[in-house]
A protein has these predicted regions:
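Elongated, amphipathic alpha-helical interaction scaffolds
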Residues: 2-189
């Protein structure tokens, strides 16, 4: 679906003949602007098929200051809230970063923490979905497939204990291998 979104965007906007969505400005243009939000919605609905049905998104401020003066702030590539109040972060990481999985967790945690409000609050949290495009193959022993989904799960029962946090890693370098395997599955039966 991503290919079709990018192709449609280029045709509609008469942008440059080629646009590389792995480049920061292009990624933010494709996924993080009002006039291209249909591309983001289509992509997210496909990625979270049967879990999310997004009809609209509202783009939120991408820069969040630290909670205290000495805390590090964050700058999301794309940050939006769905029509159902679910928070979505979409990141593109071109170069390998040793602690990228930790960074994604930190970004997700920041989106969760910022939901806390002063005064009377019942601790009800909106779900936060973080999607990480990675243009490298991670050295992490956990991230070995094209797509890896992380959720809060009980180790013993393997049951999901909360739907309030989900991180999806998409390793673009493994896409061809993934597509080849998917095609073989279709032909095998």
């Amino acid at each position: 679906e991503l290919q079709y979104c990018v192709h449609d965007l280029i045709k509609r906007k008469k942008m440059a003949r080629f646009i590389d969505p792995r480049v920061d400005w292009a990624f933010k243009r494709i996924f993080g602007s009002e006039d291209t939000k249909e591309c983001l919605i289509t992509f997210l609905n496909g990625l979270f098929e049967d879990e999310l049905v997004i009809k609209d998104v509202t783009f939120a401020k991408t820069e969040k200051l630290g909670l205290r003066p000495d805390d590090r702030g964050v700058v999301f590539d794309v940050y939006c809230i769905t029509n159902e109040g679910k928070h979505v972060i979409v990141e593109m990481q071109k170069k390998e970063q040793e602690y990228f999985a930790d960074r994604a967790l930190y970004y997700t945690a920041r989106a969760i923490v910022q939901q806390g409000i002063r005064g009377i609050w019942d601790y009800h949290l909106a779900p936060v979905y973080t999607v990480c495009f990675m243009d490298f193959v991670s050295q992490s022993p956990i991230l070995k497939e094209f797509r890896t989904d992380l959720v809060l799960t009980d180790l013993q029962t393997r049951q999901r204990v909360s739907d309030r946090m989900r991180i999806v890693y998409l390793q673009l370098q493994l896409l061809d291998k993934h597509m080849e395997a998917a095609c073989m599955d279709i032909f095998d039966g």
